[in-house]
Amino acid sequence: MKASYYHTITLMANILDQANIPYQYTGRSALFVQGVDIDEYKKISMDVQWDVFNEALDLFSEYAPTKPERSPETAFFLMDVEGISVTVRCRFNTTIKTDPYRLSIKMGDMEVWCRSLYSYLYEEEMRKFSAEIHAYLSAEQKGFTAENEQAWNQNNYLALVNRYGNPVELASKIKQNPKWRLHPFYKYMGEISGKKITHLMGSNGVKAVALAILGAEVKVVDFSQENAMFANELASGASVSIEYIVSDVLSLSSEHESGNQDLVLMELGVLHYLIDLQPLFEKIKKMLKPGGRFVLHEFHPISTKLITSNGKKHKITGNYFAPAIENNEVAFSKHMPDEEKGSLSRVVQRKWTIGELITSIGQSGLVIKVLEEEPNHKIHDIGLPKTYTLVAERV
């Protein structure tokens, strides 16, 4: 039955492509196209562009489609294609080609259009399959995390030394002005002394050491052994103590979800390593005590997804809404000798929109208190957001 379902999916896609009728598979059919296991292969659902709906009806005349049923919002007809019940629908006054969650997937030798898994954030039809979607993304995440972990454990210590110098010397600089290392989000952290703080994906430990100098009890979670080595040497040089847990954040054991943390911090270039935000924010909520605060300082998607800048010139080169998963150079490669850059493994990233972020946090039950968008400090970038700080609390 699965083979027949696959054949019918590609058959109908090919017919519509040949007729230049925009379409996308929806619901359970969209899950199938994207590789998610589904529990039945008896029904297919798809949308076509509303102003060519009648052309689609004529196109499938050999399958004896039913008379269309119409409402003010939609129209649809049913037909039987090789023993599979197919629903073809249109949504009036919408444009399929500009749907931000319309996704092209390779199936054999052809491209097939479907509704992205991530549309579950906003659409009830896809939200019905949330359990299947999260299970699929979790399995995919494990593979991507393994790739990213390998990339971040290849000579990163050398890159950190090239960037910052000797850890002991850097520790001395941090001690001179630890608050500066926490700019611009320090103002949202309140009194630091005596607080229990976890820095997720805490990298090289610079922020953790600054927090420890200010009197916090600091825990760092990161999957890079080389980051841990640098961070522990940095803490020793600053004569402070930090707990560095070498672990993937999503694999962090339940003992660290005891609800006793005053603050959880994440910052700069971290969310794009996750292809599903729900498990992260659920974990953060479990870590925080009631009234505890989550502070996120991240690169703004306008600068990472949409615009390419070169001096005074700014050009739109990306698609802000694209839910694509990318393969990029590991961030520390710019601090490595040229002769070593070519041998470095690459990382897998998924860049999130502000809307996806806010919605995911809201659905986790954390309460958003602040979203501050911050400009670049470069004079040529006046008017463009570079980073943002988000503050959410567990109530």
What are these regions (language model features)?
Residues 1-143:
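Compositionally biased terminal segments of proteins
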Residues 137-193, 206:
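Conserved class I S-adenosyl-L-methionine
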Residues 196-252:
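Class I SAM-dependent methyltransferase SAM/SAH-binding core
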Residues 254-264:
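A short acidic, Gly/Pro-enriched loop at the edge of an enzyme's catalytic core
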Residues 262-278:
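A short SAM/SAH-binding and catalytic strip from SAM-dependent methyltransferases
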Residues 278-293:
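A short glycine-rich, Lys/Arg-flanked "PGG" loop and its adjoining helix->strand segment in the class I
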Residues 291, 295-359:
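SAM-dependent methyltransferase
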Residues 356, 360-395:
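C-terminal lobe and adjacent flexible extensions of AdoMet/dcAdoMet transferase-like proteins
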